Amino acid sequence: MIQFTCKPKCFLGLLIIAIIQLLPAKSFAVVQPVTAASQLVKRLLPQYVGRFKFEQIKTTNDSDTFELESKGNKIVIRGNNANSMAVGLNHYLKYYCYVSVSWYKNNKIYVPSELPVITEKVTQTARCNSRFMLNYCTFGYTMPWWKWDDWQRFIDWMALNGINMPLAITGQEAVWYNVWKKFGLSDAQIRGFFTGPAFLPWHRMANIDHWDGPLPMSWIKGQMLLQQKIVARERELGMKPVLPAFAGHIPEALKAKYPSAKINSLGEWGGFPAKYRSNFLDPFDPLFNKIQKEFLAEQTRLFGTDHIYGTDPFNEVTPPSWEPAYLASVSKTIYNSMAASDPQAKWLQMSWIFYFQRDNWTNPRIEAFLKAVPQDKMILLDYYCDNTEVWKMTDKFFGQPYLWCYLGNFGSNTMLTGNLNVVEDRMENAFKNGGKNMWGIGSTLEGFGVNPVVIEYVFEKAWENGPVNTDKWINDWAVRRRGKPDKNTEEAWGILNKKVLMQYGALGQSPLTNARPSLTGHGDWDTDNKIEYDNRNLLKVWGLLNEPSTGVLPDVYRYDVVNIGRQTLGNYFTVVRDRFADAYNKHNLAAMNKNGEEMMQIIHDMDALLATNSSFLLGKWINDARAMGGNEAEKQYFEHDARLILATWGQEGSELTDYANRNLSGMLNDYYGKRWAMFIADVTTAVKTNKAFDQKAFDKKSNAFEWNWSQKWDVFPAAPKGDSMQVSRALYKKYAAEIAQ
């Protein structure tokens, strides 16, 4: 592993440390809702600033509500807060202007030159007032290299979609840096405790320490300043950022400073060696409350507070004891430590732990853990409702408030998944039968992936006062992806809804192109290529999207064309691999050569298609990482971190290898493609020498290749190349007949 050691001039290093520690408390200016909504229009639709008028209204029961109507030449949008006004703006853009606003800053927004008139006043009230977004992992799989302009667009997107409880964990290392300094730790001990940037989510969840560290001081300072902008903008737009609290995770170096403290190792995680294991301070130790007090005070000084704190003890690790009384004492003590510093504190807890270790987290243990916290002071995220609804298994979380959440993506994998009809049925049932303590909804996606349709559906559902016809909804979605009514686009999305979007997002999904090569199956557990639909239906969708009506094609439409095309080809790759394996079993070298060449051609063609869109570029991921560095040493460190999480994740041969696999131009040709080329060559050599192919020997060889790739410095294009429609049509023509068989 590359060990980055920051060696700035002594004066500069001390100056940065001093700046962080001595910064005055951050004051966050209050922006009036009407002003915030007007500024939203100025950012997204600057040419139409004078055409929108916002007004604030009062509502009964503080329900989030918006109203729309035309008055003269203005579109009047009313709401009880800036968030509701933003949802009203989005409703107008979606259903009157046929506009789909993407969460990516590179996607332009196309609005008609003449704004459509609202012929009849529109009023909508949210079915729930709590709408959560993000996952600790998203900050590693999607967001680690984001700068302010990326965040600004995403926060605007969240406001448009009514999200008002975003997870906000950027920059917390600056808080911890100051806190651990107060407890006697050195700069080297603190920065060495942190992981590399892309791995910080798992450090924050107390899964691993040190991995790919130490963390540069420039990163800590830069992320602190970024977080101040993030939470300020989120609050402007009517959101309550969810900040972290202390859950017991401490640096091992603290043992020497406090030898009598009750500190335990949390045990193995992800196959990492013992030296990377996290340490847990017993909540009953007097030191726990002292650390909590210092942390919350310092965090509030730097970032303010909305009194909602995300704290997740025992995430994917085993507690020191499974006794219900112990678990109850832990949760009670953690909550009390928060409340002692902030009497208004509410604890947001993800219920993933109850799903992940469901054999251990029995109902008596869950009930003890939850009921030890005062009623309504703990909010549960029912984390993975697209798979398992924990509220149904726990008597509605034994009365504590919870949010129904759609996960949908792991590792930012690029697999076409998500079933709108199942989501509709489950959400509607939760609204009707989930109890009064079902406070709202959310999305807990690990990475953005390639299925924005389901995410936007989930948040729009929060504003529907009853069942939704998914056929009609998907048709409206199709219209705004195209920018206008279009027969082919609407038919394509209708097929997707009825015949393709069948399976939920699951752990470790990918086209076979991304998998560790093998003659059967799909390599490792985290690269499952199984699909529950006929690829010929997806081929038909691809063909329809390749032939839209004339006129400007929005960026989101071109994204869809690339997305559907690369998945269709990825599915077909499995067919050709199986032909190659069959030829191997028959010792048919001619057929092996033919199918091996076609396998490599599919990978190259997928790479060429992906290269036409900025959302599918390895070069952009790496360039964004390098841009975080202030000198060449830092740039190389950040690039290494960015490569590592996509490849081995952990050490050479790690069980997490390819967990964050994704279809990206550059990854296909240079990483997955070269691995498949090695495989094809080795299998062919085995037949030529009349030997059986040795999968174990190849896996060992593959381990070395994967690790070496993460240490390289190749340059990849960071800007798209080629026209998406032209490349897509050419590839459809090339492969359609074969796939259709």
Residue locations for each model-derived region?
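Bacterial N-terminal signal peptides that target proteins for export
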Residues: I2-L12
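Bacterial N-terminal signal peptides
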Residues: L12-L22
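Contiguous, structured surface segment used for ligand recognition
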Residues: F28-C128
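Stable alpha-helical elements in mature extracytoplasmic
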Residues: P33-A37, M85-L89, D150-F154, L226, ...
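Catalytic-core regions of glycoside hydrolase
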Residues: V49, S100, N106-L115, L134-T138, ...
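Second-shell loop/turn segments in exported
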Residues: K74-G79, G140-P144, M217-S218, W322
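Active-site-adjacent substrate/metal-binding segments within catalytic domains
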Residues: C128-K147, M158
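Histidine-centered catalytic/metal-binding microenvironments
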Residues: D524-Q741
